[in-house]
Amino acid sequence: MLYRLRSLQPIWRQMRLSVAFPYITLLLWILPLLLFNSGQNSLMAHDEGLYAWRARQMLDSGDWIAPWGNAHHKTPGPYWIIASCYKLFGISEFSGRIPNMIAGILVLFLVYEISKILLAKNLAWLTGAILSIEFLWLQYCRLGTPDMPMILLVLLAIFSLIKAELYPKYSHFWTLIAGLSFGLGFLVRSFMIFVPIIALLPYLVLEHRRHRHLINPLLYLGFVVGLIPTFSWLWFNWQRYGNVSFEQLFKFVLDLGSDDRNHNGAFFYIWNIPLKSFPWFFFSLLGLVLVLRRPIPRYHLILVGFPLVMFAELSLFSTRLSHYSLCIYPFIAMLAAVGLNWLGRIYETGLIQKDIPTQSPLKKGGNIFIPPFLRVAGGNLPRNLSYATGVLGILLLLGAIFVFVWGSADIRKYAILGLIVGLGWLILPVVWISRYHFGQKFLTARYWIAGWLIPCWLALAVAGSLGLLGDYNPVYRTFLQQKAIASVLQTHPIYFVQLGGKNSVLLNFYTPIHGERVNTISQLPASSYAWIYTKNSLEPSKPYRILGKVQDYQLIQVIP
């Protein structure tokens, strides 16, 4: 058996040298995280449900301009993408999420390529692995929203600008692609595309004497070409609704910039980003310190300037939501890879000076660079972090056991998650103790770094398998799947009587045959069926019977 393994070593070595190997391994790393589910799906209200419902309206009506009967406040790119998937694969939650899954994979590959240029090849793969297991990032890779397609276009533009600088012979082509990406970004995300564009200005302006992107006419030509689909849509909208078409687009972005609809304060992202990217945000802070001490040649204003400027923009913007910060997450992953790689080398060598790869941004005279304030504690950090994660793992295991024994059936699935994640967090102390107390020197930095990646991967894989990343409204799903309710919905038009609340969009999407929208029950025909919102004070001017109730909504039938 040992002979066979040794005979396979040259084959494995050749595979690792293959150009496609990093992409294949990253794909194998993220695919289970995208696909694992409980076998049931339901949409997230409010945003995902809105995009799913509006895309379905386009497909059902055949009107791909404005099927809702009035001027719209958003550009139609996301609706066109989702509706196209409905046409190809049928109307379902999974079909609406396919574009984001594909975009998420392509973003992963782009981040790998960008990191390979900015950092080093080994750090590029680690960046991709970390990005895949950032919670908010993975969650939105599995949702039918426009965030991933926009980020794909933004990163494609950044990659193209870097390639244009690296290869002057093909700079016109790459600059055209950058402009085209920004133009198409407007189709996907409207004026929000200007947030990352502004975040790139430090690089574009302060490094202009070197790359001269801003005076390249193909950048602007590409931007205009990318705007053609949006201009075409606006033209058809203008023919129907006049100047209101333009007013709605501007009004929406002005409202977002002037009204804090969610009451998230100016410090929202200071706590939200660390929470939604745990634990990688804290590694990224270490990476940021290291990179600030030893700046990346040429691209420092991309690696550091872009996320910092974007963070400031989003904090100043009145409407603050978690997913607005998603453009920062690839850069958190890059900086986290720098920090984790540095800790891995300290784990393996302590504070002993040792050569590191020449492509690393953390080199100083060919030796490991240790900032002065970390020089004393640096050698203890890997050990302390290993033991801290072990304590966390034990606490999770104890909590999971407690829930299994005394918890209700509804929360026991969280106990499964706690049990598996708790076991995963024990990897780090086991690796540390095995190397430094039992002399297992084969447990190099790669094993220690894997001890960070594996528990996070397991946590998200189990969360997906339990339905926590795909089945957001199981109450509505189970209600609508009831035989008595499903038979009515499938065979009769359903009227809507002044539905309110953010979950009403779920009823819009899951109701196959729509009747009219009316203001009162008295407007309903005899024997008709309707959804009503119980929080509205409706006068029951006609007698009706309640067929079922889900939260604040009732399905009724008017008694003849």
Name each model feature, range by range.
Residues 1-33, 222-224:
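Start-transfer (signal-anchor) and selected internal transmembrane alpha helices
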Residues 2-7, 176, 291-315, 319-359, ...:
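Membrane-embedded architecture of ER/inner-membrane glycosylation machinery
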Residues 19-26, 111-133:
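Transmembrane-helix signature of polytopic, membrane-embedded enzymes
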Residues 51-56, 184, 188, 193-339, ...:
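Transmembrane-lumen/periplasm boundary regions of multi-pass, lipid-linked membrane glycan transferases
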Residues 98-118, 156:
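Transmembrane-helix motifs of polytopic, lipid-linked glycan transferases
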Residues 142-150:
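Short acidic/glycine- and proline-prone juxtamembrane loop motifs at membrane-interface regions
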Residues 149-166, 332-335:
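Specific aromatic-rich, kink-prone transmembrane helix
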Residues 157-174, 340-343:
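Membrane-interface transmembrane helices that cradle and orient dolichyl/undecaprenyl
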